[in-house]
Swiss-Prot record:
Belongs to the Bowman-Birk serine protease inhibitor family. Inhibits trypsin (IC(50)=2.7 nM) and alpha-chymotrypsin (IC(50)=322 nM). Dimer. Keywords: Disulfide bond, Protease inhibitor, Serine protease inhibitor. This is Bowman-Birk type proteinase inhibitor 1a. GO terms for molecular function: serine-type endopeptidase inhibitor activity. GO terms for biological process: negative regulation of serine-type endopeptidase activity. It comes from Lathyrus sativus.
Length: 10
């Protein structure tokens, strides 16, 4: 979605 924190280190 719009979660930069989640997309950060995936």
């Amino acid at each position: 979605g719009d979660d930069v924190l989640s997309a950060c280190c995936d």
